Amino acid sequence: MKMILLGPPGSGKGTQAKMLSERLGIPQISTGDMLRAAVKEGTPMGVKAKAKMDAGALVPDEVVVGIVRERLVKDDCDKGFILDGFPRTLPQADALKQTLGDLKKDLDAVISLEVDNDAVVGRVAGRRTCRDCGKMYHVEFDAPAVADKCDKCGGQLFQRDDDKEETIRKRLDVYAQQTAPLIAYYRADGLLRDIDGMKDISGVQQQILSALGCGL
């Protein structure tokens, strides 16, 4: 199963991708995680990505496409993969189509998680991240036992710039302008599956599995 998860920031793509990866036995490919690793390491690619991420804008295509292509040629993608957070623009979608054609890997489905913008802001602005181990919490839905302290390692929790309300709303605007057209792009290809992302995690997962014909 070769698939893409689409949806605005905070729509639950990462959570659903992880669950699907475990259920289907295929890798989750999160461009967000790969980009953050490059930023943390201070690589040339990471420096370019950081400036855009801090401003709530999209990372340049040449950076993201290069990362994704390198990942898709690995052996664990032979039976399938889940792209989480890519593509985000029509040029990226075209580049992905060309890459998959070169690798003889055709997409099976594109899942689009539909959510309310205000709900997204509430989900994302409540996130807190451990400075030491990177474990994530939510002040409402998954709070640590002791405020601002990681349950796992005792490290200090903080709110990433990416998770602040002003940045989130900018990212949602960027999504609407540049990423939402992908829905029409993949609908025209007959690959799109619309999913109600406002249900609970289990409910969303059940919808996705049903749309993929995988059973419950």
UniProtKB/Swiss-Prot annotation:
GO cellular component terms given for this protein: cytoplasm
SUPFAM superfamilies linked: P-loop containing nucleoside triphosphate hydrolases
InterPro entries: Adenyl_kin_sub (IPR006259), Adenylat/UMP-CMP_kin (IPR000850), Adenylat_kinase_CS (IPR033690), Adenylate_kinase_lid-dom (IPR007862), P-loop_NTPase (IPR027417)
UniProt cross-references to Pfam families, sorted A to Z: ADK (PF00406), ADK_lid (PF05191)
GO biological process: AMP salvage
Family of this protein: Belongs to the adenylate kinase family.
Domain notes: Consists of three domains, a large central CORE domain and two small peripheral domains, NMPbind and LID, which undergo movements during catalysis. The LID domain closes over the site of phosphoryl transfer upon ATP binding. Assembling and dissambling the active center during each catalytic cycle provides an effective means to prevent ATP hydrolysis. Some bacteria have evolved a zinc-coordinating structure that stabilizes the LID domain.
Protein name per Swiss-Prot or TrEMBL: Adenylate kinase
Organism ancestry: Bacteria, Pseudomonadati, Thermodesulfobacteriota, Desulfuromonadia, Desulfuromonadales
Gene field: adk
